Amino acid sequence: MTDAATGTTRADTFEDPLVIAGEKFHSRLIMGTGGAPSLHVLADALRASGTEMTTVAMRRVDPNAQGSVWDVLRETGVRPLPNTAGCFTAVDALRTARLGREALETNWVKLEVVADERTLLPDPVETLDAAERLVDEGFVVLAYTNDDPVLARRLAQVGCAAVMPLGAPIGSGMGIRNPHNIELIVEELDVPVILDAGIGTASDAALAMELGCDAVLLATAVTRAQDPVLMAHAMREAVSAGRRARLAGRIPIRRYAHASSPPREG
């Protein structure tokens, strides 16, 4: 609808913040920092994406280093989200999360505990164990997990602030391999669902939002694109378009044609 007095439409004034643990974010795109060809390109890509938060692997980046990703985040004003990437046990994840809390003075953490280096698939047993213990220590946990509705429900039950099912293995670019399970997770959970891993291009990000995800987290799809800055902008628009399409409501799928205009009578 258009406001006759101002000429603006609902789309022009659309406000739909992402809320995690009571904090609001205007962008529903969360970025990662790994794989960028240079810090300059990373900074430009973060700006183009419109993101307000980006993950940083605490085991791989020195918080005190100069000329690093930390300088980029300070320059762009993007909030860092400590990540336990590279952890294979709950014990390692707890140690890394505590390091992030001390170094960055935040109790937010993206929990990532993988089973092996070949697949980088989440270890469900270690992930659930780590999540429960981190929540008990007062962390705001955003948990990376498989596209398993039962495990997603358990993670929410132990107190995770957001659950982050994968679309496909990390860095694979295969898109969303099991959209049905993602829909089941969205239907089941009362906490935000963030599609994490496997995104290859903008249409994958749009699909995640159309399936009902609250946000998308991606890194490789942007940082290793031929033009990372242009791809970051594409992802920004895709996430926005997918979210609006979800809220607008798609038409039902029909087996046969259905005329858009009724036949004239008489």
Swiss-Prot record:
Keywords: Cytoplasm, Schiff base, Thiamine biosynthesis, Transferase
Catalyzed reaction equations: [ThiS sulfur-carrier protein]-C-terminal-Gly-aminoethanethioate + 2-iminoacetate + 1-deoxy-D-xylulose 5-phosphate = [ThiS sulfur-carrier protein]-C-terminal Gly-Gly + 2-[(2R,5Z)-2-carboxy-4-methylthiazol-5(2H)-ylidene]ethyl phosphate + 2 H2O + H(+)
Any one of the GO CC terms: cytoplasm
Active site: 110 (schiff-base intermediate with dxp)
Subcellular compartments: Cytoplasm
E.C. no: 2.8.1.10
Any one GO MF annotation of this record: thiazole synthase activity
Binding site for 1-deoxy-D-xylulose 5-phosphate: 171, 197-198, 219-220
InterPro entries associated with the record: Aldolase_TIM (IPR013785), Thiazole_synthase_ThiG (IPR033983), ThiG (IPR008867)
Record's keyword annotation contains Cytoplasm: yes
Top-tier EC class: transferase
Family (UniProt): Belongs to the ThiG family.
Oligomer status and interactors: Homotetramer. Forms heterodimers with either ThiH or ThiS.
Its biological purpose: Catalyzes the rearrangement of 1-deoxy-D-xylulose 5-phosphate (DXP) to produce the thiazole phosphate moiety of thiamine. Sulfur is provided by the thiocarboxylate moiety of the carrier protein ThiS. In vitro, sulfur can be provided by H(2)S.
Name of this protein: Thiazole synthase
